[in-house]
Design a protein with these regions (language model features):
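Conserved Lys-Pro-Asp/Glu-containing loop-to-beta segment of HAD-superfamily phosphomonoesterases
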Residues: 109-122
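Alpha-helical substrate-recognition element adjacent to the catalytic core
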Residues: 1-104
């Protein structure tokens, strides 16, 4: 059985609106500093967080092996600013292990290579 592969943006998974507003007002340097200063503060769940949590819960219903659902994070953040996102993933116990951080580039080109059948964005 092949898993359902769900690609999700960081902004759909977590509430990044405060940082995004800062980015729009003051630019990338201010945004990066803001995220680094708060890397140990968990992000709040975003609009698609409840759905992702429920999809990943399906993995615990079946015997070990190939999970029925895999969630992949696609983010326009850099790997540096993305540390806060991965810390939040760990904080909430989400089983997300594959991710792409594009440092501002479009994330859409990664959907097909990861084999995603569903793409969630906010």
């Amino acid at each position: 059985m092949r898993p359902l592969v769900v690609a999700i943006t960081a902004r759909a998974l977590f509430d990044l609106e405060d940082g995004h507003a800062l980015f729009e007002r003051e630019g990338l340097k201010a945004y990066a500093a803001y995220q680094r200063e708060r890397e140990d503060q968990p992000l709040q769940p975003g609009i698609a967080f409840p759905l992702v949590r429920k999809l990943l819960a399906l993995n615990s219903l079946l015997p070990p092996g190939v999970p029925p659902v895999e969630v992949i994070l696609l983010s326009r953040n850099s790997a540096d600013t993305g540390l806060r996102i991965f810390n939040a993933i760990e904080h909430f116990g989400l089983g997300i292990v594959r991710a792409v951080f594009t440092s501002g580039a479009d994330t859409h080109p990664y959907i097909q290579p990861f084999g995603a059948q569903l793409f969630l964005s906010a």
